[in-house]
Amino acid sequence: MKTKEIIKTAGELAEPFRINKGKDFRLKDVDPDDTLDFTKEADKPRAKEALAMGVAALAELQDKLYAQDKWAVLLVFQAMDAAGKDGAIKHVMSGINPQGCQVNSFKSPSAEDLDHDYLWRCMKNLPNRGHIGIFNRSYYEEVLVVRVHPEFLAKEKLPPKLVGKKIWEERFEDIRNFEQYLARNGVVVRKFFLHVSKKEQKRRFLERIDDPLKNWKFSSNDASERDFWDDYMEAYEEMIQETATKDAPWYVVPADNKWFTRVVVGSAVIETLASLDLAYPKVDEGKLKELATAKKKLLSK
């Protein structure tokens, strides 16, 4: 399949899951087990083949992004535990040049982080021009886990008068403004919520417990957070409603089938890069003469 065909197919696969306007979004309308027209077992090999072709196309587009050195791309991943963020990042980005990619995983904020505003640690890790930046969790934790567990807010050292009833509304506004600022400065933001079902999460947790090679992935806190499942779903839904925009859309990706999740994420990244009209820089006459002189010198020896 040619690159143009891959880009066209990628757009068709990503489009059903892209949210440009969050007002009418409802999480219940997204089936975590959805695979579009892919039949799970019969079409799984076809999906893996599509991902492999997509990885090759992505590598070509990233090379142009790096050479052109005009745009930066920021990919934000949010999800419940065991939804497959790490695997999606690993498989989709497997073919790109590490020199042009920056990956940051944001866990609980450090003491230094808490001495700054909540966007600080993410802002200082934004991708350079020509690079793809990946945030595995992000500033969105501030309207997710901090909202579900308000006690975390007390650790942020905010003046009491700034912690009012409108704090979440204010944070959504901050984030929208921040992402608009990035868009106006050539940083293309794309956000992914990998939507796994509670049932599938349970299965994956049990697999991590039963498989010695996966024990390291499991934390007892992962299981206890399931008690707050409904609270998290409400927080995710409002987060998407309040921060999905044309310049920084959310992709709400079904995550019960990892192979399908990876195809959709890969398709969205390809579609994003293809929309930037990337090309290798053209050299001027002076540079062409310089190249000709260098070639002549090399051939003469």
Predicted regions and their residues:
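Flexible, compositionally biased loop and terminal segments
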Residues: 1-301
